[in-house]
From Swiss-Prot:
Its cofactor is Mg(2+); Mn(2+). Residues 597-673 form the BRCT domain. This is DNA ligase. It comes from Chlorobium limicola (strain DSM 245 / NBRC 103803 / 6330). It comes from the Bacteria. DNA ligase that catalyzes the formation of phosphodiester linkages between 5'-phosphoryl and 3'-hydroxyl groups in double-stranded DNA using NAD as a coenzyme and as the energy source for the reaction. It is essential for DNA replication and repair of damaged DNA.
Amino acid sequence: MDRAMAADEIARLRKEIERHNYLYYVEAEPVISDYEFDRLLEQLIALERLHPDLVTPDSPSLRVGGQITRSFPSVRHREPMLSLSNTYSMEEVADFYRRVRRLLLDEGIGEQEMVAELKFDGVAVSLIYRNGLLVQGATRGDGVQGDDITVNLRTISSIPLRLETSASETLSGSDREIEVRGEVFMPKEDFDRLNEGRPEEDRFANPRNATAGTLKLQDSAEVARRRMTFVAYFLKGIGDQHMPHFDRLKLLGKLGFFTGDHYRLCPELHDIERFIGEWSEKRWKLPYETDGVVLKLNAVWLWERLGATSKSPRWAIAYKYPAQQAITELLGVVFQVGRLGTITPVAELRPVKLAGSTVSRSTLHNFDEIERLGVRVHDRVVVEKSGEVIPKIIRVAEDSGSLFSVPIVVPERCPSCDTPLTRPENEVSWYCPNEEGCPAQIRGRMLHYASRNAMDIQSLGIALVDQLVGRGLVKDPGDLYSLQLPQLEPLERMGTKSSINLVRAIEESRTKSYDRLLYALGIRHVGQATARELAGAYPYFASLHEAGEQELAEVPDIGPVVARSIIDFFSKPWVQAMLDKLEQAGLPMRAGKEKEQVNNNFEGQSVIFTGGLERHVRQEAEEMVRERGGRIVSSVSKKTSLVVAGKEAGSKLERALKLGVRVIGEDEFEAML
């Protein structure tokens, strides 16, 4: 095929692929299978590899990802991206409606309509299109400036790389540069798929956290694999300044954007109340998370006249649905065994509908929590779900009073290996001491070792680990590196191809960094931050292994408790046997070349995060501090340089204020990056 023919075929494939993207992500009416779509994309990628000069910025092949981004530069928004005022009260919604009408009447303007839209629980972004082509995508940041994440946003199939030609031609000549604002979110099914197979401690709490963390990943190929969606909720920069907001939403749909479709023009207050009431239940049937309703004045040309406070506009408000609760019966309690031997009680509930799904289980955390709640088997309990995947029991129902309720008894023996349980002094949890032989602990250690933040062996999921442990093929992570195809192929859902993929993934884990190996070992109290401190203080594994307790305790962020835990870990014969296997397998036993530093904005500073961050996943924010020369610590002292306080910050914030340690919010933290 000559160049001219290739150019024609590339153009045809691009048009066809984008048409199917639109039908799938915007219209929700696919006409071909995923396999057929993948074949079209493969054909395009193959042709572009043969003719790299024909690759353009709007090619659908860019959605596959693969680019590694060292950092995300800051960009200033054309106009501030203000957050909306929130309310959980219908009375405050009515007050907002009347206040806007009164302000307009004072200006001599008659009654105006409102637009009600579903509030998507995601991450706000801004997209800039120049001459119909996507040129920039940025996070909201502090509202004034955000991070340029264009390379990651290009992987989202519901974001047009080029605006739909037929609709874009209706824009005037002055519309050469427009801005589209909206929300990136992760559909429920894709979120469940992302969490599936991850160990408990490595799972995302909710789709919003997963989205925020994914958008800041440096590997765009991984971003593409996680399948997020974009919903557009405002169009700025068009020539017709008097185009109502409702009409702008319609135009966004014609330009190729998903707009959610569930929005309504509301002339009167009762129309708003009806919309909110309708969607309080209907929202659970949607394939994505919505947590409220946004109300905006339809007359966009009046927004500037109404103005804004320092934080939010006066022409819009967000009504948020309250946390969902249900009352059901506690049927029983099962006891799970974690990788460190911790016994966790889990409530088995009479199935009840809650937040759009059937709930039959809830964590009880520990036995002190059971005592605090005063809960017994066969009690009627109040279960709440608010943004998290796992619901929680918040209290015993007032009308419980069952004559048949019985106390929850602490088990005497491990439910996995039947070893007598122990409870260390000053701890709330019970433990199984059979570390080497308990199947549940072995399973947990294997999953932790293979998890994303450890050795990242993606082919090693829960079902496969259960088979490997159950058949005695592995007793610790060191056994992974001696697995052979004949051992793997007979396993359920494996076969030759899957077995080869697993062996390849295990081989690739040998190249992971020394600090990740230290974290993957699963030493009690040694998280990712502590593993990095240890790797920095002891760049050779042999020196760490030989270090004394007092010496370890003097390492920053270690202290006597962690030091004792490290010494105890290395003193166990089964641990030594595992380490010998890992060393023989060629795992990194010393630190490699240090990661390149982005800048020195946190040079020499010890930083701690407390509370929930709105725009970052905690581990991603901590990594940003390290990339800029800072050090993450786990407790507040007079030596702490900076405390970044998010929502519902607790005792660490109080201690910082008492000690006079500098405290900043998420906005100021982003500005420091």
